[in-house]
Amino acid sequence: MAIVGLGTDIVKIERIEAHVARSGDKLARRVLTEAELAIYIAHSQPNRYLAKRFAAKEAAAKALGTGIGRGVSFQHIHIGNTPDGAPTIRFTDGAQQRLAFLNGVFGHISIADEKSYAIATVILESC
């Protein structure tokens, strides 16, 4: 096994709150998959949830070496949780193609937040 990609992103939660106050759910609908959007809508702290998912997807795009764009969309990166609450990451479409190009087979993700910030790190691994 080898590391083929590493990415980290940090988001100021206040920035997400300001964007949502100005534009409603526009950012959430651009960043989140349908499954993630359903969780966001029902979440007790939706802006914090959105900030963590935004950081996670940006970190994943950095690990892929593309950033968002250039064939990789927010919609191609799916962030979930195990039954125990640990974050999971899954790639589809352009993100999956880029992972295959890197000979990657699996992504590891860590997401954390505190009062003002959300941060995520993604490690991509080959077999």
From Swiss-Prot:
Signal peptide: none annotated. InterPro entries: 4-PPantetheinyl_Trfase_dom (IPR008278), 4-PPantetheinyl_Trfase_dom_sf (IPR037143), ACPS (IPR002582), Ppantetheine-prot_Trfase_dom (IPR004568). One of its GO terms (cellular component) is cytoplasm. It comes from the Bacteria. It is found in: Cytoplasm. It is an enzyme of class 2 (transferase). Mg(2+) binds at D9, E58. Keywords: Cytoplasm, Fatty acid biosynthesis, Fatty acid metabolism, Lipid biosynthesis, Lipid metabolism, Magnesium, Metal-binding, Transferase. Its EC number is 2.7.8.7. Disulfide bonds: none annotated. One of its GO terms (molecular function) is holo-[acyl-carrier-protein] synthase activity. Its cofactor is Mg(2+). It catalyses: apo-[ACP] + CoA = holo-[ACP] + adenosine 3',5'-bisphosphate + H(+). GO terms for biological process: fatty acid biosynthetic process. Transfers the 4'-phosphopantetheine moiety from coenzyme A to a Ser of acyl-carrier-protein. HAMAP family: AcpS. Belongs to the P-Pant transferase superfamily. AcpS family. NCBIfam families: acpS, pantethn_trn. This is Holo-[acyl-carrier-protein] synthase. It comes from Shewanella putrefaciens (strain CN-32 / ATCC BAA-453). The lineage of its organism: Bacteria, Pseudomonadati, Pseudomonadota, Gammaproteobacteria, Alteromonadales. The gene is acpS.
